[in-house]
Amino acid sequence: MAKDIREKIKLESTAGTGHFYTTTKNKRNMPEKMLIKKFDPVARKHVDYKETKLK
Protein backbone atom coordinates (compact mmCIF):
# COMPACT_ATOMS: atom_id res chain seq x y z
CA MET A 1 0.00 0.00 0.00
CA ALA A 2 1.06 3.54 -0.67
CA LYS A 3 1.94 5.81 2.23
CA ASP A 4 -0.85 8.22 3.13
CA ILE A 5 -0.10 11.80 2.02
CA ARG A 6 -2.58 13.40 4.42
CA GLU A 7 -1.41 13.58 8.03
CA LYS A 8 -3.70 13.87 11.08
CA ILE A 9 -2.86 16.94 13.18
CA LYS A 10 -4.13 18.66 16.31
CA LEU A 11 -4.79 22.42 16.37
CA GLU A 12 -4.34 23.63 19.96
CA SER A 13 -5.60 26.96 21.30
CA THR A 14 -3.01 29.62 22.13
CA ALA A 15 -5.38 31.09 24.76
CA GLY A 16 -4.26 28.42 27.22
CA THR A 17 -7.73 26.90 27.68
CA GLY A 18 -6.73 23.40 26.58
CA HIS A 19 -9.29 23.34 23.77
CA PHE A 20 -8.23 21.77 20.46
CA TYR A 21 -9.51 20.79 17.02
CA THR A 22 -8.35 17.77 14.99
CA THR A 23 -7.97 17.87 11.22
CA THR A 24 -5.80 16.60 8.38
CA LYS A 25 -3.36 18.37 6.11
CA ASN A 26 -1.45 17.51 2.96
CA LYS A 27 2.24 17.13 3.89
CA ARG A 28 3.46 17.89 0.36
CA ASN A 29 1.52 21.14 -0.15
CA MET A 30 1.96 22.50 3.40
CA PRO A 31 5.23 21.32 4.97
CA GLU A 32 5.28 24.24 7.44
CA LYS A 33 3.22 24.34 10.66
CA MET A 34 -0.30 25.72 10.43
CA LEU A 35 -1.56 28.77 12.34
CA ILE A 36 -5.31 29.32 11.98
CA LYS A 37 -7.72 31.70 13.71
CA LYS A 38 -10.74 29.73 14.99
CA PHE A 39 -13.41 30.05 17.69
CA ASP A 40 -12.50 28.88 21.20
CA PRO A 41 -15.74 28.01 23.05
CA VAL A 42 -14.00 28.01 26.45
CA ALA A 43 -12.62 31.55 25.99
CA ARG A 44 -15.75 32.47 23.95
CA LYS A 45 -13.78 34.36 21.29
CA HIS A 46 -11.69 33.80 18.17
CA VAL A 47 -8.05 32.98 18.92
CA ASP A 48 -5.06 31.56 17.05
CA TYR A 49 -4.70 27.78 16.94
CA LYS A 50 -1.21 26.29 16.44
CA GLU A 51 -0.49 22.90 14.92
CA THR A 52 0.80 20.23 17.28
CA LYS A 53 1.43 16.53 16.74
CA LEU A 54 -1.52 14.21 17.34
CA LYS A 55 -0.53 11.39 19.72
Swiss-Prot record:
<protein>
    <recommendedName>
        <fullName>Large ribosomal subunit protein bL33</fullName>
    </recommendedName>
</protein>
<dbReference type="GO" id="GO:0022625">
    <property type="term" value="C:cytosolic large ribosomal subunit"/>
</dbReference>
<keyword id="KW-0687">Ribonucleoprotein</keyword>
<dbReference type="InterPro" id="IPR011332">
    <property type="entry name" value="Ribosomal_zn-bd"/>
</dbReference>
<keyword id="KW-0689">Ribosomal protein</keyword>
<comment type="similarity">
    <text>Belongs to the bacterial ribosomal protein bL33 family.</text>
</comment>
<dbReference type="Pfam" id="PF00471">
    <property type="entry name" value="Ribosomal_L33"/>
</dbReference>
<dbReference type="GO" id="GO:0006412">
    <property type="term" value="P:translation"/>
</dbReference>
<dbReference type="GO" id="GO:0003735">
    <property type="term" value="F:structural constituent of ribosome"/>
</dbReference>
<dbReference type="InterPro" id="IPR001705">
    <property type="entry name" value="Ribosomal_bL33"/>
</dbReference>
<dbReference type="InterPro" id="IPR038584">
    <property type="entry name" value="Ribosomal_bL33_sf"/>
</dbReference>
